[in-house]
Amino acid sequence: LRRQRQMCIRDRMSGTCISEEMMRTMRSSMLFLPAILSRAGSATVCYPGGCDIGLRPIDLHLSALRLLGARVTEDGCCMHCTAPGGLVGCPIHLPFPSVGATECVMLAACTAKGVTTLMNAAREPEIGDLADFLNAVGGKVLVDGNGTVTVEGVSSLQGTAHTVIPDRIVASTYMSAAAITGGKLLLRQVRTAHLAPVLPVFQEMGCDLRRDGTDLLITAPERLRAFKRLTTMPYPGSVSYTHLR
């Protein structure tokens, strides 16, 4: 139930299957799989879409779920997952600090039996925000900030009110628009700490950045300077969000 800038999510479930039409609209729809699986013991979803960057496999997500005890059957474009005996916590080491795979493990492990220790986890601000939310609903999640996430499974979760952190990718996109048009733009409710990997890039191109609390004013020159080198890296490397390229 959506009201203006708020969304109310009720705890009723009408099924454990999400249609291909819905899954194809958004890459992050993949996160419904661990959420439904951990609650209902089974889930059927199709491969997610919604990303124009190119092929982005979900093998890390599925491998992690299998380690937690899920049985995953792939049939064409769909995946059917079951956990007959429930999910069980275990140590998991990601070969790459994938944001989606990290979130997948956190959601699945929240009500799994025992403790899950996720190593080489993503360090994006959204990981900390998800941990804050899960803890608010009764979970036991610890993010150490250095790539390790520890989740102690609980028997049940509860409702809560949570404010999502400002979207750093949207903010960076607006900043890019201001830069290429030689304009001036005031962004409100920005967490500049989350933008730390990209702010030096805008400054190197000649943009003037002024911060005032949660406000960020960017003023672009008539002609941008070329930056010497730009490489995408896992957060908090520079530049750490591939979407911004």
PLM regions and their residue ranges:
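Structural preference for solvent-exposed beta-strand-turn elements
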Residues: 3-245
